[in-house]
Amino acid sequence: MKLLHLALAGAMMAASFAAPAMAADANTMTIQLKDGPVVVQLMPELAPKHVKQIKELASKGEYDNVVFHRVIDGFMAQTGDVEFGKQGGKSFAPSRAGMGGSALPDIPAEFSRTPFERGVVGMARSQSPNSANSQFFIMFTKYPSLDGQYTVVGKVVSGMENVDKIKKGTGGNGEVTDPDRMLKVTVGQ
């Protein structure tokens, strides 16, 4: 009888460890790049509305084949312009990439105290703090001037070496000619 209780306690303990892993999986975004996958742990506890919108866009395939239109070495790589950033065909407008968003509404700012450092994923926006929509950026390094000014939505937990290989832009704005792209973006897989 005592052995049965120990086995049952062990099974219950194993089940309690399995539950959080499943919850974390629902907030895992995988970005497939030409050099390999990048896994981002999304943080709905910091930015629930932003994370919800990213998940919705990813689940609809809206981020697939979208270019990294602005990449500044030593700063960040920006992507997610689903309106203008599609690679190939008529949907790719290099002169307009970075100017759009998605068909979904803009999201009010959800600023936090989480610092912008290497691997942090933040939402891009215009001058208005409440203008984030679909575009996001991945930090190459720490950048304190962004802290509390932009919404943090996640952090790269693996594949940062693949982010480092994204083709860099030129000039002060980091516009990229013949840019790399997100081949496929999935959430919870």
Regions found by a protein language model. Name each.
Residues 3-6, 10, 16-189:
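Cyclophilin-like peptidyl-prolyl cis-trans isomerases
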